[in-house]
A protein has these predicted regions:
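Glycine- and aromatic-enriched membrane alpha-helices
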Residues: 1-364
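Conserved small/polar residues in nucleotide/adenosyl-binding loops
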Residues: 368-375
Length: 379
């Protein structure tokens, strides 16, 4: 759980954070921030004594990681090229939806251990029934969150957005984690549906209003839905929930717990990020960000087997290999072919002393022609 809290932060701060800084703040989260708030919630602390309930970590793990991610991304600033001169967000899509899908389904499967395993023991019939309810609610919330995110993106952007749908699945898993043992399937369904919709609007809000650059949507998935799931437990708990006629006390304790944990994380991590920024530095240089952190931070040409980085300086090309559209017949081509074509321009060789890294980046950008529906709406 502690490791999960620390790794959530890396997604929102991706592509521009120094690796050493990542190691330092992850160590501080693991050694200081997480243990204190986890003690408040699970270790017989004051929130536990008040009756605060977080079964498997919507607040203790996901909300803490999400708040830290939001703060870190804000202090880092956006990636180069994320926002134009007019302030509008530009799409920087992920490189591999297949890998994303695989990762989501691995997480979904492992969440049965994350939530179901938090039952700790199955020595009695009651414990086994409880674990069964936990796993059922977990799967139901995730499935309905996925459908809700898909439909919401379809309605808003004209086509279903794959990446947002996957994030919706994770949002449902995060949200149900707090109360999966206290809510019935109806409550789990509502929690999941709201989580899927909330994830979509949250991504838009942070991209376009707050202008916090979160490459993977970690803040929307973990912070916003960790908060929603914890508060929703106060609403839908069959034994103590507000909507089941048990009054405001439990609901109020859930809200208070979220506020106090957020305050602790914001104060402690603001101090830590500020110290890192003033000493070893939090962000890489502009050149390192453009070239890629694989090269400068880890000494790798590329971390992705699907990418082959080569220097095109001396390449001889006369036609567009993608559309077979050369310079001579571009005037007769259809609008669709012109839009799809990558213009080939013969140039003199670059000077030997000029770093070709920028040239590679330009080539990669030119070859990108098909944004997702959400990305088109942001462009």
């Amino acid at each position: 759980f502690c490791a999960t809290t620390a790794t959530i932060v890396s997604g929102a701060m991706a592509e521009r954070t120094k690796f050493l800084s990542y190691c330092v703040y992850s160590g501080v989260i693991s050694a200081l921030v997480y243990p204190i708030e986890a003690h408040w919630i699970w270790g017989g602390g004051w929130l536990a004594d008040m009756g605060f309930h977080d079964f498997a970590g919507s607040t203790a793990v996901h909300f803490v990681g999400g708040v830290t991610a939001c703060l870190g991304a804000w202090m880092l600033g956006p990636r180069i090229g994320k926002y134009g001169k007019d302030g509008k967000a530009r799409a920087i899509p992920g490189h591999n939806l297949t890998a994303m899908a695989l990762g989501v389904f691995i997480l979904w499967f492992c969440w049965f251990g994350f939530n179901g395993g938090s039952t700790v023991a199955m020595a009695s019939d009651d414990a086994m029934v409880s674990a069964g309810l936990v796993c059922f609610n977990t799967n139901l919330a995730a499935a309905l969150a996925t459908v809700a995110a898909l439909i919401t993106s379809w309605v808003r952007y004209g086509k279903p957005d794959v990446s947002l749908t996957f994030n919706g699945a994770l949002a449902g898993l995060v949200a149900i984690t707090a109360g999966c043992d206290m809510v019935d399937p109806f409550g789990a369904a509502i929690i999941g549906i709201v989580a899927g919709v909330l994830c979509i609007f949250s991504v838009e809000f942070f991209d376009n209003v707050v202008k916090i650059d979160d490459p993977v949507g970690a803040v929307s998935v973990h912070c916003m839905n960790g908060m929603w799931g914890t508060i929703a437990t106060g609403l839908f708990s069959t034994s103590e929930g507000l909507l089941y006629g048990h009054g405001f006390r439990f609901f109020g304790v859930q809200v208070l717990g979220v506020i106090c944990v957020a305050a602790w994380v914001l104060v402690s991590m603001t101090v830590i990020f500020t110290i890192i920024k003033k000493t070893i530095g939090l962000r890489v240089t502009e050149k390192e960000e453009i070239d890629g952190l694989d090269i400068h931070e880890h000494g790798l040409t590329s971390a992705y087997s699907g990418f082959s980085i080569s220097d095109p300086t001396y390449a001889e090309m006369s036609v567009n290999e993608n559309t077979d559209l050369g310079e001579d017949d571009i005037t007769m081509a259809s609008e669709a072919k012109i839009n799809a074509a990558v213009k080939v321009v013969k140039e003199e060789p670059l000077p030997a002393e000029l770093d070709s890294g920028m040239h590679k980046v330009v080539m990669i950008c030119l070859l990108y022609t098909s944004p997702s529906p959400r990305d088109r709406s942001l462009s």
